[in-house]
């Protein structure tokens, strides 16, 4: 995929977008995210990867989401951050990256998996997105295949457009930005 700079963003931002550390193409036969996506979309992306373009401005929220993952590495030293797990199923090597694996015992055998999302309030106002839950369940399966006893799953949504005034109105509007 080619990253463009239609909006003339500062070079540092464009280069940060281009240098995404996510290991595209090095994750196995299929990643958890691709596994839950529509098959035609995955096939077309793979077939036309070299022809695809995306503007750096359209990747800003993704870039900021990556910064959250870096910050999380400073939290709770016993937790494992950004761990890629692999397992085989029906001849496929499936992979998924857990944002945080929190050990519930000293042997790191019993765990809780946390997935962090930097998103809009409107993405959570009616509940968890089905694809987020699906991704967590793939991670749960991968963890179990790697010998972990998964006792809990959490999606932690960081709401970039949260408003204290709207929260005061009540209803199903989130009462905090996390």
Where are these regions (language model features)?
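Metal-dependent nuclease catalytic regions and adjoining charged, substrate-binding loops involved
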Residues: 1-8, 141-178
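Metal-dependent nuclease catalytic cores that hydrolyze phosphodiester bonds in DNA/RNA
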Residues: 1-113, 120-133
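A structural signal for short, well-ordered beta-strand segments and their strand-loop junctions
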Residues: 80, 112-115, 150-157
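A short secondary-structure junction signal
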Residues: 115, 124-126, 164-169
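Short acidic/polar capping segments at secondary-structure boundaries
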Residues: 118-121, 160-162
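An active-site-proximal "capping" alpha-helix that borders the catalytic cofactor pocket
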Residues: 132-144
């Amino acid at each position: 995929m080619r990253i463009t700079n239609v909006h003339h963003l500062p070079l540092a931002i464009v280069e940060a977008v281009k240098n995404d550390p996510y290991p595209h193409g090095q994750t196995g036969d299929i990643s958890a995210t691709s596994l839950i996506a529509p098959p035609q979309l995955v096939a077309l992306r793979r077939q036309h990867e070299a022809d695809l373009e995306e503007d750096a401005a359209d990747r800003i929220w993704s870039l900021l989401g990556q910064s959250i993952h870096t910050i999380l590495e400073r939290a709770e030293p016993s937790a494992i951050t950004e761990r890629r797990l692999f397992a085989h199923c029906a001849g496929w090597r499936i992979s998924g990256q857990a944002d945080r694996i929190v050990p519930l015992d000293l042997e790191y055998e019993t765990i809780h998996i946390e997935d962090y999302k930097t998103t809009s309030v409107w993405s959570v106002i009616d509940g968890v997105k089905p694809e987020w839950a699906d991704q967590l369940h793939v991670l749960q399966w991968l963890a179990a295949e790697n010998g972990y006893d998964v006792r809990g799953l959490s999606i932690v949504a960081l709401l970039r457009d949260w408003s204290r005034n709207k929260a005061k109105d009540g209803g199903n509007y989130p009462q905090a930005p996390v």
